[in-house]
Amino acid sequence: MSMLTITIDGKTTSVPEGSTILDAAKTLDIDIPTLCYLNLEALSINNKAASCRVCVVEVEGRRNLAPSCATPVTDNMVVKTNSLRVLNARRTVLELLLSDHPKDCLVCAKSGECELQTLAERFGIRESPYDGGEMSHYRKDISASIIRDMDKCIMCRRCETMCNTVQTCGVLSGVNRGFTAVVAPAFEMNLADTVCTNCGQCVAVCPTGALVEHEYIWEVVEALANPDKVVIVQTAPAVRAALGEDLGVAPGTSVTGKMAAALRRLGFDHVFDTDFAADLTIMEEGSEFLDRLGKHLAGDTNVKLPILTSCCPGWVKFFEHQFPDMLDVPSTAKSPQQMFGAIAKTYYADLLGIPREKLVVVSVMPCLAKKYECARPEFSVNGNPDVDIVITTRELAKLVKRMNIDFAGLPDEDFDAPLGASTGAAPIFGVTGGVIEAALRTAYELATGETLKKVDFEDVRGMDGVKKAKVKVGDNELVIGVAHGLGNARELLKPCGAGETFHAIEVMACPGGCIGGGGQPYHHGDVELLKKRTQVLYAEDAGKPLRKSHENPYIIELYEKFLGKPLSERSHQLLHTHYFKRQRL
């Protein structure tokens, strides 16, 4: 590939042909502001609408200013990024964006994380000289997971890229013109009435408060203050890999112990770990896989393979809408969150000697779809949900700050027994490929009766959107598929329909898996941040004395005292579910 020379603000560098001015500026550590631009190249995600014009620069020999995010470098190009003309243009663009933008920064959920707010501060904009007819054109759209406030939409089109190109859901598109132009569902439908999967990737990339999570922080505070309730909490694997980012701890640092300590200081009666339920999920899902595989190898043509993982609620809703003819293919095992809730409201409530109605189960999740999942009616008993409240990693960070807890100064503490113990197979649920890797560790030993010497399955790891691997289990060679991002899942299922053989497929809706979930601290397009989170979970796995789910002594005890065995009648009643054919609107 030929290299091109470019000079930016007096600094010269060489970049590959096809690079943009913005790409070249990054190699020189020159910060050109952007709003609509988003590039997660390692995940094959990019939004280069070049519509906001905040990134304009002056190119020698050209009359007009050029958007640096979409202008390719030419050889010997000379660029100025901070000339008076450029600065005035950027200020004008920002002033126009603010002309009809709500001025409610003090109470906006995105305050402090809003990229428009940050740029207004950076360029010293204290008032807007333009009157854009500031008024409310749209009602708020509030679903269980997401709140849309389209008066704050700046038409960056990032959410549209994530929804249509990355997730292939097709819910969002540009509508209307002028001051009323926004990105929204067709016919002004509510998100809850569309094929939206609640994955929250639109929220993860929105630069303003137009798309935010539906917060339930106050509901948690009220529950903790209720003397008539026993309030317990579970924390998902990916939370510990990212929580510290919002609480003054360096990215890539595991904060498992500090998180447990903080939750106790918030007032939770018992602090548990969703990792326990991840081990339980492997026992059920792995046993279901071996059962199906055995019947398939024996010639039973009624058995459906590949088995599809069912841990991700965004993925579950996606296949309910998009693949209604495949509802008998996914595992019937509930997600770890819902397994935990079912066990907590039965087994653990019995241990405490209280009715399930007295127990409040709070989940801390990296995922917005978990808010939707816990409200699905099949996950409740007589109107009492297995999981009562779900908050995100971001919401927990806000709660810790609100309660004046010095998070960085907390000592490390352990989770409570019995629902806080886990093996190394559990934390890797938070990364793409982790669920299938954990399942393979257990499936191998249950199927062969032999000890698995090498527990790391490197072929299913990594940030590739689609991965395929062949794994030897006894005399059988299993073909495994892994996808993260719903568009990649759609692509992976195509060869299945065309007759290509897979025995098991793992799907996670979010880029990188749960570490890139819609409820995690905002990554602002930094793929390296996602990689650091991944490393935290693999390190936690490697540091555990037990690394296979079936070795968890508390899981063994749970089966001996309560469930009987995997796939037993009680296990099916509490730990398995069914799926629904949903309309495609």
UniProtKB/Swiss-Prot annotation:
Q: The 4Fe-4S His(Cys)3-ligated-type domain covers which part of the protein?
A: 85-124
Tell me which UniProt keywords the record has, alphabetically. Answer: 2Fe-2S, 4Fe-4S, Iron, Iron-sulfur, Metal-binding, NADP, Oxidoreductase, Repeat
Q: Does the keyword Amino-acid biosynthesis apply?
A: no
Task: Kindly give the Pfam families that the UniProt entry links to this protein.
Answer: Fe_hyd_lg_C (PF02906), Fe_hyd_SSU (PF02256), Fer2_4 (PF13510), Fer4 (PF00037), NADH-G_4Fe-4S_3 (PF10588)
Q: List residues binding [2Fe-2S] cluster.
A: 36, 52, 55, 69
Q: Name one GO molecular function term.
A: 2 iron, 2 sulfur cluster binding
Q: Where is the 4Fe-4S ferredoxin-type domain?
A: 144-174, 185-216
Positions of the 2Fe-2S ferredoxin-type domain = 2-85
State the activity regulation.
Answer: Inhibited by oxygen.
Activity dependence on pH, as recorded: Optimum pH is 8.
Give the main EC class: oxidoreductase
Catalytic activity field: H2 + NADP(+) = NADPH + H(+)
Alphabetized PANTHER family for the sequence:
NITRATE, FORMATE, IRON DEHYDROGENASE
Q: How does it assemble?
A: Heterotetramer composed of HndA, HndB, HndC and HndD subunits. HndD is probably the hydrogenase subunit.
What does this chain do?
Answer: Catalyzes the reduction of NADP in the presence of molecular H(2) to yield NADPH.
What this protein is called in its record is NADP-reducing hydrogenase subunit HndD
* Species whose genome carries this gene: Solidesulfovibrio fructosivorans
